Amino acid sequence: MNKHPKDAPLVGAIEAGGTKFVCAVGTCPQDLVRTEFPSGDNPAQVLAEVTNWLKEQQHQRGMLQAIGVASFGPLDLHPDSPTYGFITSTPKPGWKNTNILGAVKRAFPDIPTAFDTDVNGAALGEFCWGHGAGLRDFVYVTIGTGIGGGVMVGGRLLHGLVHSEMGHLLLPRLPGDTFAGVCPFHGACWEGLCSGPALLARAGMPAEDIPPGHEAWTREIQYIAYAVANLVCVLSPQRVIIGGSVRKAGQLGQDRFFRMIREQVRTALNDYLVSPALQEEIDSFVVPPLLGDEAGICGAIALAQLLAQQKIV
């Protein structure tokens, strides 16, 4: 994939998140014009705002060669399905059964459009320009409004039957933890226990306000470690990248947050799997995204770039 503005085609990108839509036009992470719109509960309105902005940028900068859409889900990613391009059974108010891809295609009928999950997009962004570069097998997890994950296997994104929904893994409960969880589908799944809304419900305050010694952080980190250990056992990744707003960990701090997760992952695995990556090199095994908060929109750029260049990941 071309990684420099002089080599890469001009593309549009949409990162459709549960809280906000991030839109960009450019050629690579160093060459982006971007804006944001609140997701709200009126899909028609926000999609009109998004597509109108992309049209304005196209008028100013020239014809877009492709558009990449990386969206929250669940999604229908099967091109032969009558609901291909739809957000399907999301708990987000107003967005169930929204034809997000169709809205983009109607606005840009002559421009090819790539479509995938937001977390697959972020994984692809890290694969092209971040901590997944040079790796063929890794996992990207985001912990924010919800929890989701993208998986790279053999240098290609994993899709399979539907797409990964690792945020709904069912985890062993910690002794004495009676928190019911906030997931409307599963209650105390990983997302129900560890998402931003879960931290708010458990601690009575948002993540950025929770003091470092609060029990909510102890449980949060232990459950994340359980989930990472499960991913290691099932997928055998070369690296686990954890993004999303919760990983900043407020007053606890991102460095301490990751250090504690790594310690608990080692404890959970209990030296069953033998690899330097899981022992002395674990500091480079469980890491935050190199692209930071831009992983998702950079992934949408990468989706569009690959389509424009007729490459498949």
Predicted regions located by residue number:
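Short beta-strand segments
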Residues: 15, 68-72, 116, 140-146, ...
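Short clusters of small/polar residues that mark proteolytic maturation junctions
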Residues: 36-37, 92, 162
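A charged helix-plus-loop insertion that forms the helical arch/lid used to bind
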Residues: 81-97
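Adenylate-forming
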Residues: 121-128, 149-151, 170
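Charge-lined substrate channels and their catalytic hotspots, especially those that engage the 3′ end
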Residues: 158
